[in-house]
């Protein structure tokens, strides 16, 4: 069983590594974006609230996001663990998530933080935008997204480091090497739980 929070700036390879973890551990990859889309598509009461925020171009409030995550973590496929991606993004969200996970007795095992130099991130995101024909990912938008990450989200690394639950992985190496490093960390977690 593993409960992991995947962390890193846009372009660090979180989605790629999440796919490897899903295959390795047979646990669900939970992204806030997917949760929002599913709730809206299913027109749940929470989904209708999300739709109202998205339609008006506003950010979905933390409390609503936490409620959706709580709903997702009560589904049967998370019994063996989960990979949470895209949340938390701020200290307030991290604290709310800590409280929720404590309440539902599903503490996370590790925060896996992928680190990549900013110039490499920019190159990756520009290439991805070209490859996927994403016109909204202009160099200016990419810089803004990275700026938001460094300002709002990166400070959470200290929060998790202080709890001694942070594992930092060099994401600026071949994909298979990153995967091997993550697998080693997961194997160590399994060993800790046996002892």
From Swiss-Prot:
Record-linked SUPFAM superfamilies: P-loop containing nucleoside triphosphate hydrolases (SSF52540)
Enzyme class, first EC level, given as a word: transferase
Tagged with keyword Lipoprotein: no
Listed InterPro entries: Adenyl_kin_sub, Adenylat/UMP-CMP_kin, Adenylat_kinase_CS, P-loop_NTPase
Source organism, top-level taxon: Bacteria
Localization (cell): Cytoplasm
Catalytic reaction list: AMP + ATP = 2 ADP
Pathway: Purine metabolism; AMP biosynthesis via salvage pathway; AMP from ADP: step 1/1
One GO cellular component term noted in the UniProt record for this chain: cytoplasm
Gene Ontology molecular function: any one: adenylate kinase activity
Binding-site list for AMP: 32, 37, 58-60, 86-89, 93, 134, 145
Region described as LID: spans on this chain: 127-137
Pfam families registered for this protein in UniProt: ADK (PF00406)
Residues reported in the UniProt entry to bind ATP: 11-16, 128, 173
Keywords: ATP-binding, Cytoplasm, Kinase, Nucleotide biosynthesis, Nucleotide-binding, Transferase
Domains as described in the record: Consists of three domains, a large central CORE domain and two small peripheral domains, NMPbind and LID, which undergo movements during catalysis. The LID domain closes over the site of phosphoryl transfer upon ATP binding. Assembling and dissambling the active center during each catalytic cycle provides an effective means to prevent ATP hydrolysis.
Described function: Catalyzes the reversible transfer of the terminal phosphate group between ATP and AMP. Plays an important role in cellular energy homeostasis and in adenine nucleotide metabolism.
Family per similarity comment: Belongs to the adenylate kinase family.
Descriptive protein name: Adenylate kinase
Organism from which the protein derives: Cyanothece sp. (strain PCC 7425 / ATCC 29141)
């Amino acid at each position: 069983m593993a409960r992991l929070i995947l962390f890193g700036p846009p372009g660090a390879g979180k989605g790629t590594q999440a796919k490897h973890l899903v295959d390795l551990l047979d646990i669900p990859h939970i992204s806030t974006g997917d949760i929002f889309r599913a709730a809206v598509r299913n027109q749940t009461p929470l989904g209708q609230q999300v739709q109202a925020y998205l339609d008006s171009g506003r950010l979905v409030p933390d409390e609503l996001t936490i409620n959706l995550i709580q709903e997702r973590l009560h589904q049967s496929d998370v019994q063996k663990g989960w990979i949470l991606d895209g949340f938390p993004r701020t200290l307030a969200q991290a604290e709310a998530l800590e409280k929720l996970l404590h309440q539902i007795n599903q503490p996370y095992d590790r925060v896996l933080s992928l680190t990549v130099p900013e110039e490499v991130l920019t190159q990756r995101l520009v290439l991805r935008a070209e490859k996927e024909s994403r016109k909204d990912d202009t160099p200016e938008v990419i810089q803004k997204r990275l700026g938001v990450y460094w300002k709002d989200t990166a400070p959470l690394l200290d929060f998790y480091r202080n709890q001694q639950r942070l594992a930092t992985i060099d994401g600026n190496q071949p994909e298979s090497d990153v995967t091997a490093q993550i697998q080693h960390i997961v194997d160590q977690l399994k060993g800790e739980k046996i002892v």
